[in-house]
Every structure is written in C-alpha cells, then in structure tokens.
C-alpha cells in the first residue's frame, strides 16, 4: 500500500544557523577589548574580534569584514578620525558603521544624540546591556545569510 504524504504534514526544513553579526573592537587597551569581547560573546548575539594596534585597524577590518566597528576615540599617537576615514574610504568597508567609544563625554550627551565627526558614540565606562543597546541601534539590517542587507525604499504612488 502506497501512502501519499501531503507537504503540509511534512516537518518544516530546519533553517541553518544564521551567522552572528561580526563586531570589531579597536582600542589600545587589551583589558578593555578583552572584557567587552567576553561580555558581548556571552550574550550569544555576536562574533567579536579585537584589535589593540590602531595602525593595523584598517587591515584587520579588511580581513574580518565586520558588520559594525567600535572605535576608541582617544588612543595615544593615533587619530581615530583618520582610522575611521580610512575604513570609510575602503570600497569593501564603506558601509560598515563606526561607533566611537569615548570617556570624554557624559552619558547624557550620548542620549542627546550628538555625534562626533558624523559618527554616533557611546560613553565609557559602559555596561554590556548599554553596549548591546548601542550596537543594536547602529547595526544595519542583516540578510538571511548573515551579511549586510541592502535596503530598498519603496514608495506608493
């Protein structure tokens, strides 16, 4: 006896695990990047890379291809604005959001929506829940395969 099984009764295909958004932290403090990496990875939401040598930041970003970059604004002997500009001028990275991290502002200035050199910023010290909220505010929409999705604007006439 042959049985016909309708498609409605078959289990849904198991969706492959989506790639987590890639976050790159650029800060000269190894202790800071390590603790942030650990905290973010414990949320289970992100894959996190660290770069503690600002001179290698652009090269690391090219290799990692992050979905978002957290960049310390006050690193010795480094102009973080130049680091951000190099990343933004790279055709493979120009759409990657850069969020500055700084101890030079207050949390109320962050809440006011001010920007530094056209970039959003988060105040240090920062808790992991605050950091996750800041990342989620600035993380672009990701496609099903885990890469940045291009957004299309549709208007109704």
Q: Where are these predicted regions, by residue range?
A:
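Two-component/phosphorelay signaling modules centered on CheY-like receiver
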Residues: 30-49
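Acidic, metal-coordinating helix/loop segments flanking the phosphotransfer/catalytic sites
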Residues: 50-68
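Receiver (REC) domain active-site loop signature in two-component systems and cognate sites
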Residues: 75
């Amino acid at each position: 006896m042959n049985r016909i099984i309708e498609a409605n009764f078959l289990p849904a295909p198991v969706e492959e695990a989506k790639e987590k958004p890639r976050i790159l932290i650029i800060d000269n403090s190894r202790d800071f990047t390590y603790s942030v990496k650990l905290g973010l990875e414990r949320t289970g939401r992100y894959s996190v890379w660290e770069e503690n040598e600002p001179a290698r930041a652009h090269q690391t970003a090219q290799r990692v291809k992050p979905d978002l970059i957290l960049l310390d604004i006050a690193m010795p002997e480094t102009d973080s604005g130049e680091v951000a500009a190099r990343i933004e001028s790279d055709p493979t990275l120009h759409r990657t959001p850069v969020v500055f991290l700084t101890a030079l502002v207050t949390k109320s200035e962050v809440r006011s929506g001010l920007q530094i050199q056209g970039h959003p910023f988060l105040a240090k010290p920062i808790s992991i829940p605050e950091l996750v909220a800041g990342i989620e505010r600035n993380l672009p929409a990701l496609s099903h395969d885990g890469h940045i999705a291009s957004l299309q604007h549709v208007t109704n006439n």
